[in-house]
Structure formats: structure tokens, C-alpha cells
Amino acid sequence: MKITKIDVMILKPNQKNTGGGVKIDWANFDRNCRPIVCRIYTDEGLYGDGEAGMLFGVGALGTAGMMRDFARMIIGMDPLDNEVIWDKFYKQGYFTQSGGPIIYAAISAFDMALWDIKGKYFNVPIAKLLGGSRRKELRCYASQLQFGWGLELTPAFQTQDYVNNALKAVSEGYDAIKIDFFTLDKDGSGFTEEQRCGLLEPYYVDLVEERVAAVREAIGPTVDLIVEGHSFTDALSAVQIGERIKKYNIFYYEEPCTPTPKMQKYVADALGIPMGSGERIFSRWQYAPYIENLSLQVLQPDLSNCGGITEAKKIADMAYIYDIGIQAHVCGTALTLATALNFESVIPNFIIHEHHVVQFRPYMKELCTMDYEPVNGKFKVPEAVGIGAELSEFALTHCEKWTIE
């Protein structure tokens, strides 16, 4: 079997189809959503779909350009040779070694598509090819409740807003939630970098603690609470905040500072509570120092930007040696969601699955053929062959596309 053609696409979601209820364009939450995907075709009629994890922020055009360069390198190769292709991307791209998000997101998209083809070729879900599912359902948490929950995006400004969003998720059966308490002031204005970093003013620390304390009291002691930092604080301010909130039984503290192994260890050692990070850490080489210095207890590789399924499995195996858990970062289309569910069903050190608020958006749902939803805070593992999802006809006809043959 040979790769004959590759389509690289920047999708154009119907962002008028928000489902209603969007009360604020928080960091252009809806407006700047543009998934980057690929479809790899073969001479046997099989094809595979993959996603590059650059859904928000900057870098979409750069990622698509990187994918076009990579595509030329693998035309004519056997799509079942995912390890050979991965190393070709990494070693023969020259500047690709020790790369960043654009390079690894591009590799991830192709790797995902190759595994999709492999699953279809053997007529099994990729979980079977990864070694078999240890679990048929996955506990998940409601993620990013500062935006709101469900179709009604009601961003939290006042302390009661955080409480209301948390209780809404808990009422739907979730026994774990994640919230960023750090970003917005009481009036909805964003805190500046100077206000979030360095030695903090009492007002900021008091406000964060007030919000965390209120949510913990509302949800009770049996619901796990993940505190999301988004690296908006630095190591110094993260420790100040962490000292105030750790008494509220934090499940783990995510991205408390810019990802660097030494500063992450400084925060971990100072606070003595579980730490998570990973959506901006790429490849086993970048994860290795965090694993070796034990500064993270939960690694969060994104299968659409860490280097793909091939690389994520290696990262998980490395972490397993050190009793470090895995929670895949998931913020994309159903391609990434289904892939993560397959992957997390296999690994022994799975912690919990992330169910991101973006996956409620109708414009995201119409990009793929499958729409996976949890029931009472648990996802069923996909049974469809391949990664378990494909691009929809809408996606294929609403995109900017480059074809490489």
C-alpha cells in the first residue's frame, strides 16, 4: 500500500452556528476557531484523517505550511510504516529536531491520519493496535468552566458565577471539574500580566482564594477540583496563590507557570500538591526532564500537537516508570477527541479525560461524522474502526485546501 495524495486543510466552521447564548467573545473564543486537518489517501482506496492542535491562538498558516512541506516527503511511502515516517519527519527535516508547536502539530496530524488508515486496514479501533483497551469507559471532567458550561456560555466574573457554572456541571453527573480562576476581574476586564505575575497585590490573591473557596464549598468534598493556570502566572505568583488555595483539596494545579523544568520543580517543591502540564510541551525529549525531576504528577500530552499517537504512547510509557499519570489534553474536533479516548483506554497510567467546553459548540460538531458525548461524567470508548471519527462533508467543502500528489 502506498500514499498517493494528501489534502491539507484549514477548516472554516460556520461560526454563526454557536447554538446561542454566547454572551462574550472571550479572547475571540468563537471567532478565531480554525481547525487544521489533513486527509491521507492510498492506492488501495483507504484514507485517514488527522488534526493539528493549533485550533486557537496564532500559527495556523505556519502549521498548514509545515504540513505541506512534510506531505511532499511521504508521497509513495507505505502508510503502515508510522515509525519510519515519524523518524523521517524528525530526522530529515533538519530544523525539525527539537522543534516547537508548529512542527509537532504537523507531525501529529499526519501520525493521527496514518493510525486511522492502519485501523481501517486491519478493521479494528486503534486501541486494539495500541495493545488493547483496559477500560471500556473513561471518567472525565468538565473543563474550562470559567467560560460557562453547555451551549450557554456564561463567563464568570463574580464569585457566584464560578459557583453557578460549577454546580451546573455537577448536576449533569460530573464528579470532577476544572476552572481558571485567574483571568478576569469582577467587572469582566482582564487582569494584566503585571497584575498576575511577580509579587502579587493582596487584592488579587484574596480574589482568587475567594473564588476557589466558594466553589469548593458549593460542590462539596467529593467532587475533584482542578485549578487551571494557563501559564498566566509565573513561578513566584503561582506559589503565592498555591499557598492560599491548597487547603481546598486541589486535585491538581495545571500550568502554574511557563513550562520550564526548573521553574516547574520550584513550584512543585514549594507547594507539595499534584501538578499537571503538557499542552505546550512537545515530544519525549521535552517531557523527559519533567519526568526525571518529578516536577509533574500528571502529564497532559495533546495527541494533536505532542507528536501524535506514536509519540504520546512513548511519553506515557516513560511516565509509567516514574508513577506519573496521564491525562490527554483535548481541545479540538472529534478527530482529536476520539483519538484521545482510544489512547487513554489503553495506557495503564490514565488519570482522567478532559471534556472541553468547546466541544459543545454546534459549529465544531458539524465538522466530523461522529459526535461523542459523556453520560454522567463518563465517556464510552469508541468502537468504530480507525481513530473513530472522520471529517464530515461540510468540513471537506468549507475549507482552504492544498493538495499534494
Language model segments and positions:
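Extended hydrophobic packing segments that form well-structured cores
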Residues: 386-405
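Conserved, mostly hydrophobic/aromatic
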Residues: 3, 45, 70, 110, ...
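Metal- or metallocofactor-binding catalytic centers and their adjacent structured scaffolds
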Residues: 41-121
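Shared catalytic-loop signature of beta/alpha-barrel
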Residues: 243-252, 258-378, 382
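Metal-dependent enolase-superfamily TIM-barrel catalytic cores that perform enediolate-based chemistry
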Residues: 137, 142-261, 265
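Short beta-strand/loop segments at the ligand-binding rim of alpha/beta enzyme cores
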Residues: 133, 139, 219-228, 268-278, ...
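Ligand-binding pocket scaffold of soluble enzyme catalytic domains
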Residues: 38, 43-44, 49, 81, ...
